[in-house]
Amino acid sequence: IVLSKQRGLVCHPAHGHESGTLANALVYHCGIDHLGTVQGEDRPGIVHRLDRDTSGLMLAAKDDDTQRALQNLIRTRTLDRRYITLVHGHIAMDEGTINTGIARSTRDRVKMAVSDDPFARQAITTFKVLERFDSTRFDDGYTLVECHLFTGRTHQIRVHMRHINHACVGDPLYGKCDARADQGLTRQFLEIAACPACHS
């Protein structure tokens, strides 16, 4: 199943979000017996997730074999997961790779952070600059970037962009404190660019 997830929608039940999730909607429309259960009963059919405030196309599976096969494509990096984000400032390089560990922040447990802790999980993001925009009174310009995920860590793009000092515009967790620099955006400017697709 290919789904268009709206911003603000949580993918699966978790503390504080027991109902009204994408997983709940899948069960309502398909029935629990017609969804993959590889991820457990609280994530029926879910192949991969998107952060609550990230919108775009997602994949869900109607049976365990399909769910396993799609997740294997993600693990082996066969699925192309590209995102578009607008970040603060002008990124000097036209393209690059960010390869770090990511773990939960020791200062704020809501956040993730780049970490060299041995228990941090490897996270790899490549980026390509699409366009640079002029500066304003409140910011030193913006860069429209295409990001390609080779791993799928929580808040990965948001953490990596912040790590290189180019936080996503409108990001309430990792962004700038001055809301005027977000140009009136009330949510993070981060979208999945296209449906994950298999490339040979």
PLM feature spans:
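RNA pseudouridine synthases
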Residues: 1-111, 118, 134, 138
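A generic structural signal for short beta-strands and their flanking turns/coil linkers
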Residues: 7, 79-83, 94, 98-100, ...
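Pseudouridine synthase
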Residues: 18-26, 30, 64, 75, ...
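Solvent-exposed residues in well-ordered beta-strands and their adjoining turns
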Residues: 88, 92, 130, 148-150, ...
